[in-house]
From Swiss-Prot:
Residues 30-60 have a biased composition (Basic and acidic residues). It comes from the Bacteria. This is Uncharacterized leukocidin-like protein 2. Disulfide bonds: none annotated. It comes from Staphylococcus aureus (strain NCTC 8325 / PS 47).
């Protein structure tokens, strides 16, 4: 009987200890949960405060792409590559929302690449059988298609530029005001700026004298070409000439100076950066633009072997072009490609 009592007392004590332990654990857990909740509420409040600060900061400051207090920039990009001509068009469309101006505003930056397509060819049927085709001219053409409500108001570059590097900045200020300067940099904290910068060693950029409010054209034309220790004008028949005694019809490249010496625009190609500033009457919802990139090629013809014959130069003998039509939706600020075609044997000819 005594043993039974002892067992009951021990059992009761065990239960009491277990209950006390469980209560302590629950209390500790509740206390920890309370601490975690307080910590979470503190973090949430801190995050909300930071978010409010960021939001207020965004509302009260002018971002780099803003125009004044309520202006806004919407950017679109379209890229078209044509394998046949090895020409790439990359166009940036910057829509400017300016509540102080009664027209739509658009900046179009024409970029991409026009590969040189430098070629050495053999033509056995001719006396001067070794040919070099090189890019003597690059052309970029931009026109508004049959829409008098959209006008070109400015362009970069302007006139003729002969420096090895071209840098210019276009600036737009609220109210439709615009300006352009040489070099790179912003003119005002309340203006939106766009820069162009490209290399054209041994070439000149010429803006066509026939440009108007619906059509602009730029030509990048070879001038005095430097290669190795030589400097020869584009009009010189001896340009890139090499002693042809070691050359054969099978190796036309040996009739000309080593191509690694050629200027970059001859050897590799041209990367244009041209800018057009346009305005559009708000009653007009859509406008189409036609953009053409063209490569003109001169052909230099030399006769291989020991029998000398004067070199032959044929200017603008060949050419390839890529023509793309883009459509701008002014209301939705979108751009799409609606047509594209390319062709060979189409060198650009002004007129």
């Amino acid at each position: 009987m005594k043993n039974k009592k002892r067992v009951l007392i021990a059992s009761s004590l065990s239960c009491a200890i277990l209950l006390l332990s469980a209560a302590t654990t629950q209390a500790n857990s509740a206390h920890k949960d309370s601490q975690d909740q307080n910590k979470k509420e503190h973090v949430d409040k801190s995050q909300q405060k930071d978010k409010r600060n960021v939001t207020n900061k965004d509302k009260n400051s002018t971002a780099p792409d803003d125009i004044g207090k309520n202006g806004k920039i919407t950017k679109r990009t379209e890229t078209v590559y044509d394998e046949k001509t090895n020409i790439l068009q990359n166009l940036q469309f910057d829509f400017i929302d300016d509540p102080t101006y009664d027209k739509n505003v658009l900046l179009v930056k024409k970029q991409g690449s026009i590969h040189s397509n430098l070629k050495f060819e053999s033509h056995k049927e001719e006396k001067n059988s070794n040919w070099l085709k090189y890019p003597s001219e690059y052309h970029v053409d931009f026109q508004v298609k049959r829409n008098r409500k959209t006008e070109i108001l400015d362009q970069l570059p302007k006139n003729k530029i002969s420096t090895a590097k071209v840098d210019s900045t276009f600036s737009y200020s609220s109210g439709g005001k615009f300006d352009s300067t040489k070099g790179i940099g912003r003119t005002s904290s309340n203006s939106y700026s766009k820069t162009i910068s490209y290399n054209q060693q041994n070439y000149d950029t010429i803006a066509s004298g026939k440009n108007n409010n619906w059509h602009v054209h730029w030509s990048v034309i070879a001038n005095d070409l430097k290669y190795g220790g030589e400097v020869k004008n584009r009009n010189d028949e001896l340009l890139f000439y090499r002693n042809t005694r070691i050359a054969t019809v099978e190796n036309p490249e040996l009739s000309f100076a080593s191509k690694y010496r050629y200027p970059a625009l001859v050897r590799s190609g041209f990367n244009p950066e041209f800018l057009t500033y346009l305005s559009n009457e708000k009653s007009n919802e859509k406008t189409q633009f036609e953009v053409t990139y063209t490569r003109n090629q001169d052909i230099l013809k030399n006769r291989p072997g020991i029998h000398y014959a004067p070199p032959i130069l044929e200017k603008n003998k060949d050419g390839q072009r890529l023509i793309v039509t883009y459509e701008v939706d002014w209301k939705n600020k979108t751009v799409k490609v609606v047509d594209k075609y390319s062709d060979d044997n189409k060198p650009y000819k002004e007129g």
